[in-house]
């Protein structure tokens, strides 16, 4: 894969994997803009993801996420997606057409330690699903859409950033 100048870098992965944190660091390191789709959703909804999930349900949150992503028109940006972006083929094809999709792979026990409450975090999943259930359901989707997979489970932010930079065809 050859990375064209001005292409976006799209980060996908489970909630708690570090998409937003690493996205900011990556954008700064390569001189790109940073876009966090979770923040765009919150701005459009006028409430937190957790509140939106509570008031409208997980399917409405997934739909809004897909609409926000399909409305993106950016270049030279690092885009941190919500963990459920991969449920929308249309949204993911829109993202893939604009750049390189990087799956930030993280072990369940690491994610579990970072996420206090799935509901408060705004994780778009049916009631009763555990984080393990959500991860098992999403891994095949992340792997399907990823151009690159970077394992970051036992790395701090700087190490994870170095791993991403090493694997990106910049």
Ranges and model annotations:
Residues 37-85, 89-93:
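ATP-dependent small-molecule kinase phosphotransfer cores
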Residues 83-86, 107-109, 155:
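Short glycine-rich anion-binding loops that position phosphate/pyrophosphate groups of nucleotides
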Residues 97-140:
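A glycine- and Lys/Arg-enriched "phosphate-lid" helix/loop adjacent to the NTP-binding pocket
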Residues 14:
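P-loop (Walker A) phosphate-binding loop of NTP-binding proteins
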Residues 11:
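Hydrophobic anchor at the beta1->P-loop junction of P-loop NTPases
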Residues 1-5, 25, 29, 100, ...:
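NTP-dependent small-molecule kinase module
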Residues 19:
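Conserved lysine of the Walker
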Residues 22:
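Hydrophobic positions on the alpha1 helix immediately C-terminal to the Walker A/P-loop
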């Amino acid at each position: 894969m050859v990375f064209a100048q001005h292409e976006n870098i799209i980060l996908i992965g489970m909630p708690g994997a570090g998409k937003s944190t690493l996205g900011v660091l990556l954008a700064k390191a390569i001189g790109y803009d940073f876009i966090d789709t979770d923040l765009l959703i919150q701005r459009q909804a006028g409430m937190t993801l957790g509140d939106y999930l509570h008031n409208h349900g997980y399917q409405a949150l997934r739909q809004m996420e897909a609409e926000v992503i399909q409305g993106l028109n950016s270049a030279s940006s690092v885009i941190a997606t919500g963990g459920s972006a991969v449920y929308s083929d249309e949204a993911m094809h829109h993202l893939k057409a604009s750049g390189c999709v990087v799956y930030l792979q993280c072990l369940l026990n690491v994610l579990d330690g970072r996420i206090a409450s799935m509901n408060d975090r705004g994780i778009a999943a049916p009631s009763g699903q555990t984080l393990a259930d959500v991860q098992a359901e999403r891994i095949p989707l992340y792997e399907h859409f990823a151009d690159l997979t970077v394992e970051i489970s036992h790395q701090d932010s700087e190490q994870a950033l170095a791993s991403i930079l090493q694997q990106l065809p910049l």
